[in-house]
């Protein structure tokens, strides 16, 4: 793999992480609304925007979409968007941003381990130093979270924090499955670009979110003043545009430029940006442990890049 391709892939991976970090902040901005309502609002907006953007090319794309492609679009939309965000928003509101960022920070480890089994992937022993630094960085955040009590620092008490922790674990499993499946599907596609595939996932996600929206805005709806509704609409639209459309497009671009084992490391950028947004929201500087975590996570990504470059040089 050429160095220029690696740098482009890292750049798009960092942009995706910056955009996706916003999804951790959205539940804090809309605490008056449930995770189900936030998920429905975000993905209804995402589906609408995606439908408008894909409409001019839809007729040309339809002949290339068979039963397998539609089935993949449905399960990728469910796992990577609807199911993932219901659990993530629940985790943030119950357990706090720090705890949720910590658990989701294990994504690179999970994806990299799975990716190391693929054909042509680097063996796990060559990725061990990078993974060790990544785990050390996550451990720093864990120590900080446990020491400050943020694991139980949600709106409820310790009980809500435990529930939030398991919600974050469920989100981790959901998105790990999506990341691996989506990367492999992007590798198979010939006549459909990564951008169009992202928009198709958006359209399908919007349709699936209707099944969430009906009960979310009828059965469990509570009265809200008009100002809160406008705030909710603004946050939903903003997350749909920046995280779902822009972030996913950057991620799909990175997925085509980088091997699966390296894609797993790129998810670390989401953790870094989520922590950064959390500091800005809480109006404080990071602690020494948090700074150490950022340094370790960044070093983990750089070591992963180095491992792939060494493998490239040794193979030719």
Predicted segments, located by residue:
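Glycine-/small-residue-enriched transmembrane alpha-helix faces in small-molecule transporters
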Residues: 1-40, 149-187, 207, 316
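Loop-to-transmembrane-helix transition segments
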Residues: 8-16, 60-87, 163-171, 220, ...
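Helix-helix packing/entry segments at the starts of transmembrane helices
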Residues: 11, 17, 41, 81, ...
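Specific transmembrane alpha-helical segments of multi-pass solute transporters/efflux pumps
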Residues: 19-24, 55-104, 140, 240-258
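Transmembrane alpha-helices of multi-pass small-molecule transport proteins
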Residues: 32-83, 108-114, 173-181, 198-219
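C-terminal-most transmembrane helix of multi-pass membrane proteins
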Residues: 43, 143, 260, 264, ...
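Hydrophobic transmembrane alpha-helices of multi-pass small-molecule transport proteins
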Residues: 50, 54, 123-152, 289-308
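C-terminal transmembrane-helix exit sites in multi-pass transporters
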Residues: 53-57, 107-132, 142, 272-291
